[in-house]
Regions:
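Loop and turn regions of beta-sandwich accessory domains that flank beta-strands and are enriched
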Residues: 495-619
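Extracellular low-complexity, Gly/Ser/Thr-rich intrinsically disordered linkers
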Residues: 363-496, 591-609
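Residue-level detector of buried hydrophobic side-chain packing
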Residues: 128, 235, 296, 323, ...
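Extracellular hydrolytic enzyme modules, especially secreted metalloproteases
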Residues: 166, 170, 227, 231-396, ...
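Active-site-proximal segments of metallohydrolase catalytic domains
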Residues: 99-102, 107-120, 158-265
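N-terminal prosegments of processed precursors
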Residues: 1-115
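Exposed beta-strand and adjacent loop surfaces of beta-rich binding modules
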Residues: 6-8, 18, 48, 125, ...
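Boundary/activation segment at the start of structured domains
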Residues: 107-173, 530, 544
Length: 619
């Protein structure tokens, strides 16, 4: 699956005009707009692109070419009704993802990954076929394509490495993915024909016939499987990728399963994308994205907009991962790294558990390490990584420390951020704006953390580090450095927790000469430290030596704060502190959460009074 590119693409009209359009969506459901925002569709009758309007919630042709001015009164940014979009998505998804094959979805049913066999470790050999059409010739040769797929230190045409190099770096050397490149093979029809008819079978057969291929060279027999299956087939066709038809174009970059037996070998997963008009147009981004599905069984971590009982669009992780929209960065020549969440699921990382009170130096590009904070749920955790403007991160929309909130049971359709509906991998956007969830952009300045002093992420900040069920995960980050090759961050609170203070004004009379006395209470939240206890009491009374004060803790333990001393005097205005009141010190505890009770007794007759106020501070 491949999300639409951010930049406009060119289409050629029957008149000979060349026009720019924008695409939104992916190969399952997409829509087109002119660069000034009018909805456009391909009109089969005129074999051209026309302005679209809505009829019963669906796009219909206005009959006016997009090369002409827009019809008067036509609104911009028209969208089909949700039910229409859902129907288009379901129909196309059924074509590309038949039920009897392994899922290729945003839901990672296999502990976060897609079902089906993984080829994410060791040496893997793929087959790459360069394809041209009867009317469109390839603008490059296999001599141009082979280094794009396999070379060390590949830097041609703005690319920051080859496909092989990309996966070597991301896997910390655990995956060595090479490709045999053949072609070009010329197909029998014009390019437009294959937008409606899948070219895969013809391309594979042509490659076998013309280059005497033995598919067994690219196949693996895994334990428990009776047959050999080709690991990966990459088909790159002549010209730019076509993002043309609304939801039904077979030339939209995609991956799928094509199953056919060739002798003792069976084909399996393939990917398909445009190669560009010349060697200068060769880019690794989309090839790496689709091979993330083929080899590693990575799900897309962007929002299809039409899955899992959700028809609202969002951006998921945006540009911050190859499997979001990150394959488009650097004009698809410098794709974003695979995020720590997916690298960890692939088995490419070793966990470094973030310990409170420790400081960490996070080196950029140390892709074999995952800095982890676990929660009480095994499927849910936080990951922290250095995403400074270095290497494959150079074109990110922001740079700094990224914090990912991960749950293998989430869905990348669910932008709600609630206990039951949340992303599989959510970027905690440092500015708290949640623009990715709001479908406002694919990433922007302010998304990542940098140059922070003191606590910048906890259960009480915005954004916060609470688990999806609202409980505190315990993750506290502070003192984040400037972005660079190495970033430092400390874990745990900067100082001891702030004391919890409460006060009350009962103005309650104290029963005279009565054993039961007066009881008043205060409630402190669970987890409140009671290493130090301070109590303030104010009582108006005509003979204070009649009074005795007790304090009872939530666990039932009780101490006497003030005994009857004899003598005379009015009123009590006193402070009791566990640091210099040995008896009160017996109630100190790590957790003082619960109900505290002040018990006031007047143990002699005649003189009376009342409890005006009292206060407690726990810390």
């Amino acid at each position: 699956m491949s999300k639409a590119p951010p930049e406009p693409f060119a289409v050629h009209l029957p008149s000979g005009d060349r026009l720019l359009l924008r695409a939104f969506g992916d190969e399952f459901a997409s829509r087109l707009e002119t660069v000034d925002g009018y909805a456009a569709i391909y009109d089969d009758a005129s074999k051209s692109y026309v302005y679209a309007t809505l009829e019963d919630g669906a796009y219909v042709s206005t009959g006016v070419s997009v090369a002409a001015p827009a019809p008067e009164g036509l609104a911009k940014h028209l969208r089909e009704a949700p039910l229409i979009r859902q129907h288009r998505f379901t129909s196309r998804y059924g074509e590309l993802r038949p039920a009897e094959t392994d899922g290729l979805e945003t839901f990672g049913h296999n502990a976060g990954l897609l079902t089906g066999r993984q080829r994410s470790h060791g040496a893997v050999r793929g087959l790459t076929i360069l394809v041209e059409f009867d009317d469109v010739r390839a603008g490059m040769s296999t001599d141009d394509l082979e280094p794009l797929m396999n070379a060390d230190d590949y830097r041609r045409h703005g690319n920051f490495g080859s496909v092989r190099n990309y996966f070597q770096v991301m896997s910390a050397g655990k995956l060595d993915y090479t490709n045999s490149v053949v072609g070009p093979v010329r197909l029998s029809r014009d390019k437009a024909y294959y937008d409606q008819h899948l070219l895969v079978e013809e391309a594979i057969q042509c490659a076998i016939d013309e280059f005497n291929l033995d598919l067994e060279d690219f196949a693996t027999q895994l334990p428990g499987e009776p047959r050999k299956i080709v690991d990966a087939i990459n088909i790159l066709y002549a010209g730019e990728s076509w993002y043309t038809r609304t939801g039904n174009g077979n030339l939209w970059p995609h991956n799928h399963r094509f199953v056919k037996r060739f002798g003792d070998v069976e084909t399996g997963l393939y990917m398909l994308t445009g190669a560009g008009n010349s060697a200068a147009g060769l880019r690794i981004g989309t090839i790496c994205h689709e091979n993330g599905h083929l080899l590693c069984r990575f799900p897309d971590i962007y929002d299809y907009g039409n899955r899992d009982q959700d028809d609202r669009e969002s951006e998921g992780i945006g540009y911050y991962c190859l499997m979001g929209a990150g394959n488009h960065l650097g004009y698809r020549a410098v794709p974003a790294p695979i995020c720590a969440y997916l690298r960890r699921l692939a088995g490419w990382t070793t966990d470094v558990v973030l310990e409170p009170g420790q400081s960490y130096q996070l080196r950029h590009g140390d892709y074999g390490i995952a800095y982890l904070h676990a929660t009480d749920r095994p499927s849910e955790y936080f990951l922290v990584e250095n995403r400074s403007a270095v290497g494959f991160d150079r074109y990110l929309p922001d740079h700094g420390l990224a914090v990912l909130h991960c749950d293998t049971l989430g869905s990348n359709e669910w932008q709600d951020g609630t206990q039951w509906r949340h992303y599989q991998c959510a970027l905690l956007q440092a500015d708290g704006k949640k623009e990715l969830e709001g479908n406002l952009n694919r990433g922007a300045a302010g998304d990542l953390y940098r140059d922070r002093t003191g606590v910048f992420l906890s259960g009480d900040t915005t954004p916060n580090s609470r688990a999806w069920n609202g409980s505190r995960s315990g993750l506290i980050l502070r003192d984040c450095s400037t972005p660079g090759e190495t970033m430092t961050v400390a874990v745990g609170p900067e100082t001891a927790p702030q004391p919890e203070y409460q006060e009350a004004y009962p103005f309650e009379p104290i029963p005279d000469d009565a054993e039961q006395g007066l009881e008043v209470t205060m409630e402190f939240p669970a987890g409140t430290s009671a290493q130090r206890i301070q109590v303030w009491v104010e009582i108006v009374h005509t003979w204070r030596e009649d009074l005795q004060l007790h304090l009872r803790a939530p666990n039932g333990s009780s101490v006497v704060l003030r005994r009857r001393h004899g003598g005379s005097g009015d009123d009590i205005r006193e402070t009791y502190d566990s640091e210099d009141h040995a008896t009160l010190g017996k109630l100190t505890a790590d957790d003082g959460g619960g109900t505290w009770t002040l018990w006031v007794r007047d143990l002699a007759a005649r003189d009376v009074g009342q409890l005006e106020a009292w206060a407690m501070q726990l810390g």
